[in-house]
Amino acid sequence: MAVALTLNDLRKRQAPDGSIDVVIETLVQSNPILEDVRWAEGNLPTGNQTTQRNGLPEVHLRQINRGVPVGKSSTKQVTDTCCLMESRSEVDVELVSLAPDKEAFRTSEDMAFVEAMGEAVAHHMFYGNSAKNLDEFNGLGIRYNKYGGKKHDASYQVINAGGTGKGKLSSAFLVGWGDRAVTGIYPKYGYAGLKRQDLGEVDAIDANGYKFRALSTLFKWKPGLAVKDPEMVAAVRNIDLGAVNAAAATVEQKKAVVDAMIRAQGRMRNLNTVHPVWY
């Protein structure tokens, strides 16, 4: 996998005229997670294939004139796909003509679409589920939805906070962003981040099927998520928000959530090699 870059890194590499700045700033302001994500080019036209080590070889103590068994590690391959997100802005040319600063007016209209795209990507990072919708990529919620597994399994990284279905349940995720850990991905030979294309003046169609002239902008993003090392994510699931946020919540109840987060963080290794963030 290629070296992963943040959106701010990409800002420095694209559009010397600064036209990309306003897009990136809007994305980051609408969802801070988009500033944390490292984006890397996948090794497939549709995403990325990662080889994960899921077992270590045994180590033996050797005696003089005696050998040891041959050992080996075990691995598995995981394929992560990118999805295709698109949206179009169409602003009536007559409406634009009324604005004192036409370009600024059109940009302000477009930024609503930029913010919506950012929210969609951030949502999929946690809640995407390809089993329910093949067009989505799997988010952290579906990848870490079980607990109690063996070490090196994703389920081992999950701590159960003990909440039940009676109240509103939530989760907390600790993500270690990094080249060899967790990254956002885009297709091989593709582009990172949101692409905004000015389509110029086109025929738009109203609700009755009638045409009018409009200035159109196409927004496109092909994001995905790759968890190269499952131990670079930890989660606390089934947090009872009613018990924690309620006025009657006890110190012990709040402390239990903090203790669960500390336990979860303890299951991540080499935190100094990644950019860890709680969500």
Predicted regions and their residues:
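N-terminal low-complexity, intrinsically disordered segments
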Residues: P45-K76
